[in-house]
Amino acid sequence: MSNYVIEKTLNNNVIICTDENQHHEVVLIGKGIGFNKKKGMELSDSVMIDKVYKLEQKKDQDHYKALVEIADDNVLQTIIEAMDIITHADRTVVDKDLMVALTDHILFAYKRIKQHQFIKNPFLIETKQLYSESYQIAVSVIEHLNKLLDIEFPEDEIGFIALHIASSKDDLSLHEVRLTNEIINKSILIMEHDLKYKIDTNSIQYQRFIRHIQFLIRRLQKGEIIQVNDEFGNMLKAHYPLCYNIAVKIIKMMQQHLDVEVYEAELIYLTLHINHFTQQNEKNTNV
């Protein structure tokens, strides 16, 4: 049985407490749970508690406390409700990891937007394609924020929030998620420069390509090695030298980012994916 000491009552349905047994900062959600509750009051396990968000790490607790101190109660409540939207939509989301990151991001994004300061999301297209489920959840979150906070979060913010969600559910750090997006973005720029045409980011070829890059990065980070038939590899290099040279450039760029060795087989498979773009472009040109 948990005993909680109330730190802050946001409204009748949301309170921030300390779990006396485990010494964790927690957010409690429940209908009427905050009614007539004051700071310092004790609260035992109750049927009124519908949801508990735990902050286990000391640094997360300190960070969250600092955010709570500077946040408007209405904004904080709306962020907690956004967390509820996310965890109801996807049960694989690790809420203890996401709570602080989401609060921090939305709180400062809200302040920026109120001051008409906007940040461009350079990886919006990649995020939408790679993490489509997280992106759709983020759309619901932004709609909720816009409605309750009477503000207009831009589409770029949907992408940022989707990254936080994807990072939590896929057990990846936000740095890893952003690195993957950056590598994909640079790969597309290399292809567009050398192929001399714009890549259709709505095409099946694009979706397959970014998935290939995503799993290629994971293989490289894990040190996994794939094999390819030498005859097949030599044939691709001979028939599609431009695609092969583009693949070499992309692999060199990836090596700089990941500091790993990349074997010939990966070059061959990447060449194959790049060739799919050229074939589709030829079809579109001849229509």
From Swiss-Prot:
Q: Where is the signal peptide?
A: none
Q: Which PROSITE patterns match?
A: PRD_1, PRD_2
Task: Show where the PRD domain sits.
Answer: 67-175, 176-284
UniProt keyword Transcription regulation, yes or no: yes
Q: Which GO terms describe its biological process?
A: positive regulation of DNA-templated transcription
Q: Where on the chain is Phosphohistidine found, per UniProt?
A: 105
Q: A Pfam family in this protein?
A: PRD
> Which Gene Ontology molecular-function terms are recorded?
RNA binding
Which superkingdom does the taxonomy of this entry point to?
A: Bacteria
Task: Enumerate the Gene3D superfamilies for this protein.
Answer: 1.20.58.1950, 1.20.890.100, CAT RNA-binding domain, PRD domain
> Does this entry carry the keyword Metal-binding?
no
PTM comment: Phosphorylated by HPr, which enhances dimer formation and leads to activation.
- Which keywords has UniProt assigned to this entry? Activator, Phosphoprotein, Repeat, RNA-binding, Transcription, Transcription regulation
The record's similarity note reads: Belongs to the transcriptional antiterminator BglG family. GlcT subfamily.
Main function = Mediates positive regulation of the ptsG/glcA and glcB genes by functioning as an antiterminator factor of transcription via its interaction with the RNA-antiterminator (RAT) sequence located upstream of the ptsG/glcA gene.
| Subunit (UniProt) | Homodimer.
Protein name as annotated: GlcA/glcB genes antiterminator
The gene behind this protein is glcT
